[in-house]
From Swiss-Prot:
It is an enzyme of class 7 (translocase). NDH-1 shuttles electrons from NAD(P)H, via FMN and iron-sulfur (Fe-S) centers, to quinones in the respiratory chain. The immediate electron acceptor for the enzyme in this species is believed to be plastoquinone. Couples the redox reaction to proton translocation (for every two electrons transferred, four hydrogen ions are translocated across the cytoplasmic membrane), and thus conserves the redox energy in a proton gradient. The keyword Thylakoid applies. GO terms for molecular function: NADH dehydrogenase (ubiquinone) activity; ubiquinone binding. InterPro entries: NADH_Q_OxRdtase_chain4, NADH_Q_OxRdtase_chainM/4, NADH_UbQ_OxRdtase, ND/Mrp_TM. This is NAD(P)H-quinone oxidoreductase chain 4 2. Pfam families: Proton_antipo_M. PANTHER family: NAD(P)H-QUINONE OXIDOREDUCTASE CHAIN 4, CHLOROPLASTIC, NADH-UBIQUINONE OXIDOREDUCTASE CHAIN 4. It is found in: Cellular thylakoid membrane. It catalyses: a plastoquinone + NADH + (n+1) H(+)(in) = a plastoquinol + NAD(+) + n H(+)(out); a plastoquinone + NADPH + (n+1) H(+)(in) = a plastoquinol + NADP(+) + n H(+)(out). The chain crosses the membrane at residues 6-26, 36-56, 87-107, 115-135, 136-156, 169-189, 210-230, 244-264, 275-295, 312-332, 333-353, 376-396, 419-439, 490-510. Belongs to the complex I subunit 4 family. Keywords: Membrane, NAD, NADP, Plastoquinone, Quinone, Thylakoid, Translocase, Transmembrane, Transmembrane helix. The gene is ndhD2.
Amino acid sequence: MMETQFPWLTTIVLLPLLAALLIPFIPDQNGKTMRWYGLGVGAIDFALMCYVFWKYYNASDSGFQLVEKYLWLPQIGLSWAVSVDGLSMPLVLLAGLVTTLSIFAAWQVDYKPRLFYFLMLVLYSAQIGVFVAQDLMLLFIMWELELVPVYLLISIWGGKKRRYAATKFLLYTAAASIFILVAALGMALYGEGNTTFDMVELGLKDYPLAFELLLYLGLLITFGVKLAVFPLHTWLPDAHGEASAPVSMILAGVLLKMGGYGLIRLNLEMLSDAHVYFAPVLAILGVVNIVYGGLNSFGQSNMKRRLAYSSVAHMGFVLLGIASFTDLGISGALLQMISHGLIAAVLFFLAGVTYDRLHTLALDEMGGLGQVMPKIFALFTISAMASLALPGMSGFASELMVFVGVTSSDIYSSTFCTVTVFLAAVGLILTPIYLLSMLRQMFYSTGKAPVCLLKNTPYENEVLDEAICFGTNCVLPAKAVYTDAKPREVAIAACFLVLIIGIGLYPKIATRMYDAKIVAVNTQVRQSYTFAKADPQLFAKGFLFPRIPESEVLSVSGLLR
């Protein structure tokens, strides 16, 4: 572990939260001060992350770095313990970038701007807190803290069915998160010695297999809900369909990744013995997500719901990579999380930009937009190409790594690998179908002209006024001219697309941050398999074929046991 004297991570986590508490005392009449304040806080925090990781993070070290630990409630073993490693550091940067740009995207918020930016900054802190928490109870607290601002952001600034969507999101995620609390208490209280929630110490305990399997199942439900794993995904299309564009950017770009992070951090790394038996289940769920998400996406006429089901499909590759038992597959899963975070964020942002002009998300009411909005057309097309894994884009690199990782796995039988890869490839073929179909409906076909009728509007006779709409607060002239993307909107999209193309052309930009950690985690998982392969239990015998040479597995049993 690498420790520093100055509490950098604590500062990064608490800065947005403390800044949010000052919002009620800042004078602001028209909301302009609030938006600059929110953007400034987000940008400063993101810049601080970049500085700290550039100066202090060692990519070749697989252990925890920048460790800070302060006793909070010593009577029950609870402490403020934060750190980063290869699993969390890239996701912290992703959360900082997406949240900062989502604040910049919410430039037109004029309804309760103080509350809006307060919630966005609280959400900022909670997200970072989840990724850097080294104390399992602290992770649970941050996980729960994140639910409140998301619920309010959807229910106040969402669409017509915003309360239904927000309530459904809250019920799903809050109910599932109980398993984190149960697992934390169970792991902390197991065995002799002092009670602790420190993840490092909990990971070193030797749990009975039955107990570990129960823990794994409970956490799989928790993280499966957040990752939108079938059949726990139904909250996602409703939430995206009703949330405003900046909130959808965070939902797809960051919150889904919390589920994938939890699976790797807790299920894969800390409960590796149980992972041996659940890995085939994850692989099957991954294939189901890919095919089911693709088929449902094609059937959606609402643009944001189509993108939401696309996210369900892409998260299937994360499950496949985690289940692969290979360095390449797990690395591809993490790269897929980073890649999808960038791609989904820019797609939902552009969906919001389009909605601002048309005041509709119905694809059959669009058409011919390519001529009147060429910049939006170009940005949308590039983003869609990235989502369908065009070579040279980050999605291609991550999905290829997952495919090769699963194919080259020496744990599964050749039949299981072949069927899994074939079905995933079938699902992959669906991606260009529903994305190119969406582009055709939006930018090429004639469609039906959007009808915008607002009574008592002062703009009825003004032809050149721009159509503006954010959430439930619309100023939409009846004869509005639908303008192309503004410089601010182009800049936001460009920030994402530069990274998407950069990672696609040179994936090492991202993978070098976590390669060492992935090797260490997978070595531990494969070692757990060697303990289990002599006596395959439960359903694993039908899927696993023991063919790991003993010489390939490092002897780390002393560290594990």
